[in-house]
Amino acid sequence: MASYGMGDLKKGLKIEIDGIPFKIVEYQHVKPGKGPAFVRIKIKSFIDGKVLEKTFHAGDKCESPNLEEKQMQYLYDDGENCQFMDTQTYEQVAISDEDVGEAKKWMLDGTMVDVLFHNGKAIGVEVPQVMELKIIETAPNFKGDTQGSNKKPATLETGAVVQIPFHVLEGEIIRVDTVRGEYIERANK
């Protein structure tokens, strides 16, 4: 396993603390007026989803987790679990809706995702950062609604709701940032 020092930490990095795998969701390098610099991070547990705040000083180390990522296809949700299939071996894995978490609102049947395994147990899902999804419901446009900074809510085919510019219409396919939950642009289709 690789070992990470204070200088190696960054947003998105997966680390292990006390045997629990985490993902760094926020990173801040602090240089106080007195004393040595340090790094303050917010980490989210892959096991229970809790977010913790940790401080790392020069010389502090943490390990890389024993995580395996496998690309799998989302099949369906049976009400309690989401079902995924390895497209190479056709092996199916059930992951609880709770462990899938926020990723669920971006997945359509057939979506390829990265399933995370910790010590052989499926613990989470990561969807692609940018996805193309169809708008199924939004407010109609009115005369004078042009490209501007005004936004309106739109429901996507997965059920997720994002804010879109007024000039984007129902039925259009848009690109969405799944990490921030934001509209990026219209898809070129």
Swiss-Prot record:
Asked whether the UniProt record includes Zinc-finger among its keywords, one would answer no
Sorted keywords for this record are: Cytoplasm, Elongation factor, Protein biosynthesis
Q: Where in the cell is it found?
A: Cytoplasm
Listed GO biological process terms? peptide biosynthetic process
Q: Which GO terms describe its cellular component?
A: cytoplasm
So, what pathway does this thing act in?
Protein biosynthesis; polypeptide chain elongation
Q: Which CDD domains match?
A: S1_EF-P_repeat_1, S1_EF-P_repeat_2
Q: Which Pfam family, an example, fits this chain?
A: Elong-fact-P_C
List, in alphabetical order, the Gene Ontology terms for molecular function in this entry.
Answer: translation elongation factor activity
Cross-referenced Gene3D superfamilies: 2.30.30.30, Nucleic acid-binding proteins
The Swiss-Prot or TrEMBL record describes its family as follows:
Belongs to the elongation factor P family.
Cited PANTHER family: ELONGATION FACTOR P (PTHR30053), ELONGATION FACTOR P (EF-P) FAMILY PROTEIN (PTHR30053:SF12)
Q: Which function does this protein serve? A: Involved in peptide bond synthesis. Stimulates efficient translation and peptide-bond synthesis on native or reconstituted 70S ribosomes in vitro. Probably functions indirectly by altering the affinity of the ribosome for aminoacyl-tRNA, thus increasing their reactivity as acceptors for peptidyl transferase.
This one is known as Elongation factor P
Q: Which gene encodes it?
A: efp
